[in-house]
Amino acid sequence: MQLTMREQEKMMISLAAMIAQRRKDKGIKLNHPEAVALITDYVLEGAREGKTVAQLMDEARNLLTREDVMEGIAEMIPMIQVEATFTDSTKLVTVHDPIQ
């Protein structure tokens, strides 16, 4: 299977997000890379499903709470920017204060 660098990056994000979700489901607090991967994957998949930028910006903010992540992680992530492929074009989705 021949994958472009972008496709490889998306697969790594997806894998990291799956691991993060599994840990979250077990009640294990997420670290920085896991939290970012989970939110990023949500945005990438949502764009693929046909959601709008506004929907994703709103929904991604409700994905994780401070109780889901290790101490100090929420403050380390003031925003996440994801370049996602939507049905009509590629757009930059900015999620401000992604961990409530």
Curated annotation (Swiss-Prot):
Induction context: By low pH and excess glucose.
CDD domains to which the protein is assigned, alphabetical: Urease_gamma
Transmembrane portions of the chain: none
Disulfide bond annotation, renumbered to this chain: none
Entry EC no(s): 3.5.1.5
Main location: cytoplasm
One GO MF term: nickel cation binding
InterPro entries: Urease_gamma, Urease_gamma/gamma-beta_su, Urease_gamma_sf, Urease_subunit
Record's subcellular location: Cytoplasm
Pathway the protein acts in: Nitrogen metabolism; urea degradation; CO(2) and NH(3) from urea (urease route): step 1/1
Thermal properties of activity per the entry: Optimum temperature is 60 degrees Celsius.
One Gene Ontology biological process: urea catabolic process
pH dependence text: Optimum pH is 7.0.
Keywords linked to the UniProt accession: Cytoplasm, Hydrolase
One Pfam assignment: Urease_gamma
Any one GO CC term of the record: cytoplasm
Recorded catalytic activity of this chain's protein: urea + 2 H2O + H(+) = hydrogencarbonate + 2 NH4(+)
Subunit record text: Heterotrimer of UreA (gamma), UreB (beta) and UreC (alpha) subunits. Three heterotrimers associate to form the active enzyme.
Family designation: Belongs to the urease gamma subunit family.
Biological role stated in the UniProt entry: Ureolysis may allow urea to be employed as a nitrogen source for growth and produces ammonia which may protect from killing at low pH.
Protein known as: Urease subunit gamma
Gene: ureA
